[in-house]
Design a protein with these regions (language model features):
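Surface-exposed acidic/polar loop and edge beta-strand patches at domain peripheries
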Residues: 2-162, 173-176, 180-418
């Protein structure tokens, strides 16, 4: 289905790799949403006569034109997720590695990142003139009877991709889950000198026993108060708020969103291109009973520390992958649902959220990608919500961006079309 109004449109196409996708576009941004895993390989901004894509497109992303088959492709790609991975994607009910939990086969980062979303409909909302696309998914295992409904939205004048993702529990028992958005940026937007920040004011690296044991330069299981004072494994400290080049390490850090925050956020600034990438979501202080509230800023700093496939072209080869995950989640690090249920909390914040029996909750999320003036060159220090704007404060000035930080418009569009 295709729909358009003035200079805003939503169309269905088949992209490279034989993937069915929805493209939402207006004057300032274009968003491509894959059916498979809800991957978002493109969030691009108009730059004069060209476009700049913020999102990561891995060199190893499959273009075989065939679905993943473990017998044929497993030795290189290791998992269906890595066969199709790109950009940003929703991670529910798992955030972390694949595992069997209470008899349920839980794929890496959950069903929402692996299975095919069923496209339902799309169009232009008459009231707001926003473009929207609705997709749904059902749990493949009746032991965990969840259903998912996702509506992707772009609003005229906003350089923001909005998503409302509802999780419904169709069973008679409450279910504790993890949830997250795996925002991943890549070159050419990502480059040395970019500045990372988030709403968290307390950070930690994951404990020993996970995937970063052999890849990280950071001290594991260490807590710190500022990204510019992250502890190194060899001793000393390093500023991880400044993005390096491919240095041969893959690191992870998690920061707790303050319970007093009405708005949660994470940001990446490119001071050379003068582009801001800002994720925002309802904070703990503004939570309602039916909200899925993300509790952590998670940084996956993939700077070349994985000498194995598919990150490297062969086992023991050079990791060719350079990207940054500015992820936001409710989960214990990226260690998975079973681990998150077991530890219950990280930095005093809950690692899971309960979906009540015969009920549901909704995660509302925005990703902004926009030019800015010089005031944000040294990074974003804080983000505040105004009635119709997102205000980012930097060391040398502010940047105000048209947005719907209360998600009032998103809620209205979801109610009319979801």
């Amino acid at each position: 289905m295709a729909a358009a109004f003035d200079k805003i449109s939503v169309v269905r196409v088949n992209e490279i790799g034989n993937r069915d996708v929805t493209i939402l576009e207006h004057d300032s941004i274009r968003v491509m949403v894959d059916d498979i895993g809800g991957m978002i390989p493109e969030l691009s901004s108009v730059q004069d006569t060209r476009r700049l894509n913020a999102h990561w497109l891995p060199w190893f992303r499959s273009n075989t034109m065939k679905p993943f088959n473990d017998a044929e492709y497993g030795s290189f790609w290791k998992a269906n997720l890595l066969y199709n991975i790109a950009g940003n994607f929703p991670c529910i009910p798992n955030f972390g590695p694949g595992h069997i939990f209470e008899g349920v086969d839980m794929p890496p980062h959950g069903w929402t990142a692996n299975l095919t979303w069923r496209f339902v409909n799309s169009g232009i909302d008459e009231e707001t003139k926003a473009a929207w696309a609705l997709s749904v998914m059902e749990s493949p295992d009746k032991t965990m009877p969840l259903s998912f409904k996702k509506i992707d939205v772009i609003i005229p004048g906003h350089s923001v991709h909005y998503t409302s993702l509802s999780v419904n529990n169709q069973g008679d028992t409450d279910i504790d889950i993890c949830a997250g958005w795996h925002n991943t940026v890549g070159a050419p937007f990502l480059q040395p000198g970019c500045r990372i920040s988030g709403s968290a004011n307390t950070w930690t690296t994951p404990p020993v026993g996970g995937e970063f044991d052999t890849t990280t330069r950071l001290a594991l299981g260490a807590q710190f108060d500022s990204l510019d004072k992250a502890p190194l494994a060899r001793g000393g400290k390093i500023d991880i708020s400044q993005v390096p080049g491919p240095i041969g390490y893959t690191d992870f850090a998690a920061g707790a969103v303050p319970v007093s925050a009405s708005l949660g956020w994470s940001a990446l600034i490119n001071p050379v291109l003068k582009m801001a990438y800002v994720c925002f979501f309802t904070g703990p202080a503004a939570a309602r009973e039916d909200d899925i509230i993300l509790r952590f800023n998670d940084l996956w700093m993939q700077y070349g520390g994985r000498p194995f496939t598919p990150w490297a072209p062969y086992e023991g080869g050079t990791d060719l992958t350079y990207c940054l995950g500015t992820e936001n989640s409710i989960a214990a690090y990226a260690y998975g649902l079973e681990y998150s249920r077991r530890v219950k909390q990280v930095l005093g914040a809950p690692a899971t959220i309960t979906i009540p029996a015969r009920s549901g909750k909704t995660l509302r999320y925005g990703t902004l990608f926009s030019p800015y003036d010089t005031g944000l060159d040294e990074g974003v220090l804080s983000v505040e919500a105004e009635a119709a704007a997102l205000v980012c404060s930097g060391a040398k000035g502010n940047g105000s961006f048209k947005a719907d930080p209360s998600f009032a418009m998103l809620k209205g569009i979801s109610g009319r079309h979801g």
